[in-house]
């Protein structure tokens, strides 16, 4: 009896510390769970901030590329201006001298001076008509006035802008032709093509040899200018017509290769599989799932981001 009483006391003493330890561990686990939830919320917020920063980086990179291009162009123009600055100054001096001369010419090209000059020429050269001389002098006066206006516009502008405009004119892209050739694609459904019989339509390529054509070009290089201009105008106004025959519903063939004349377009449409809304959604989700990892790898390579590998869980030691 005494032995049994002693064993029961020992078991009661062992249960008390175990329950206290369990309570402590439960409290610790609850605190850890709270901390984990707070950290997960902070991680989500940081991910959103990272996405915003990535978008800002993209925009900043585009702005940097544009600024670098502008800086290169400006540096080139400044170098050219430094090299040719004395020549530009001499040009402006000559422009001012020409303007002073034009003022003198305008005074001399007045109506009284023109009439006196016409009368003197009429007396010296009796064969010439006075009207023709007057028109010639009047045209010359108009040329001087237009040239004077151009010089005033050059004098008001800065040398840098004048030089940039000159550079654009010299090194600019080649001017496009006023009347480019057109390519007209015609279908069998077009009424104009349906009127043309099939015998008249030529689908064969030109049989002329390329080497002969190149020799003819070399021989005709030294022809007259007027003939060249007429050929260029013909080439500009000519249109390239391309006839594209399309299959009708009567010419649709079976799998065996036999033509079915009685088949209708409705039967052909029914043979094709129909896609439901669920199938479209499933395919779109699949495409997105395939595209997401490739985007992640691209962002890592562009911005040198660390790889998002899953953390390895270390095995806990057994008590």
Swiss-Prot record:
Keyword presence, Phosphoprotein: no
Superkingdom field: Eukaryota
Keyword DNA-binding: no
Keywords from the named record: Cell cycle, Cell division, Centromere, Chromosome, Chromosome partition, Coiled coil, Meiosis, Nucleus, Ubl conjugation
One term of GO molecular function: chromatin-protein adaptor activity
Free-text description of this protein's post-translational modifications in UniProt: Ubiquitinated by the anaphase promoting complex (APC) at the onset of anaphase, conducting to its degradation.
Chain's role: Plays a central role in chromosome cohesion during meiosis by preventing premature dissociation of cohesin complex from centromeres after prophase, when most of cohesin complex dissociates from chromosomes arms. May act by protecting centromeric rec8 from separase degradation during anaphase I.
Family statement: Belongs to the shugoshin family.
Other comments on record: 'Shugoshin' means 'guardian spirit' in Japanese.
Name the UniProt record assigns to this protein: Shugoshin-1
Protein source organism: Schizosaccharomyces pombe (strain 972 / ATCC 24843) (Fission yeast)
UniProt lineage: Eukaryota, Fungi, Dikarya, Ascomycota, Taphrinomycotina
Chain's gene name: sgo1
């Amino acid at each position: 009896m005494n032995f049994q009483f002693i064993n029961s006391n020992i078991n009661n003493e062992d249960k008390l510390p175990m329950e206290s330890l369990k309570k402590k561990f439960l409290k610790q686990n609850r605190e850890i769970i709270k901390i984990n939830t707070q950290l997960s919320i902070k991680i989500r917020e940081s991910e959103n901030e990272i996405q915003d920063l990535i978008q800002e980086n993209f925009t900043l990179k585009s702005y940097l590329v544009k600024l670098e291009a502008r800086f290169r162009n400006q540096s080139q123009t400044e170098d050219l201006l430094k090299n040719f600055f004395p020549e530009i100054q001499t040009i402006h001096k000559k422009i001012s001298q020409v303007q002073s001369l034009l003022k003198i010419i305008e005074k001399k090209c007045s109506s009284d001076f023109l009439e006196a000059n016409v009368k003197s020429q009429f007396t010296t050269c009796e064969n010439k008509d006075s009207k023709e001389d007057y028109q010639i002098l009047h045209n010359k006066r108009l040329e001087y006035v237009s040239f004077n206006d151009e010089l005033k516009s050059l004098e008001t502008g800065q040398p840098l802008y004048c030089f940039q405009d000159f550079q654009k004119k010299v090194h600019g892209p080649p001017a496009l032709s006023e009347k480019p050739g057109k390519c007209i694609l015609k279908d069998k459904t077009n009424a104009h093509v349906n009127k043309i019989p099939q015998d008249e339509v030529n689908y064969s390529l030109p049989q002329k040899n390329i080497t002969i054509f190149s020799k003819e070009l070399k021989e005709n290089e030294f022809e007259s200018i007027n003939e060249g201009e007429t050929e260029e105008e013909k080439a500009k106004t000519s249109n390239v017509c391309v006839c594209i025959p399309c299959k009708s519903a009567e010419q649709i063939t079976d799998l065996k290769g036999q033509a079915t004349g009685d088949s209708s377009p409705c039967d052909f449409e029914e043979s094709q599989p129909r896609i439901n809304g669920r199938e479209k959604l499933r395919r779109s989700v699949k495409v997105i799932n395939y595209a997401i990892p490739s985007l992640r790898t691209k962002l890592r390579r562009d911005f040198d981001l660390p790889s998002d590998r899953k953390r390895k869980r270390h095995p806990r030691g057994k008590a």
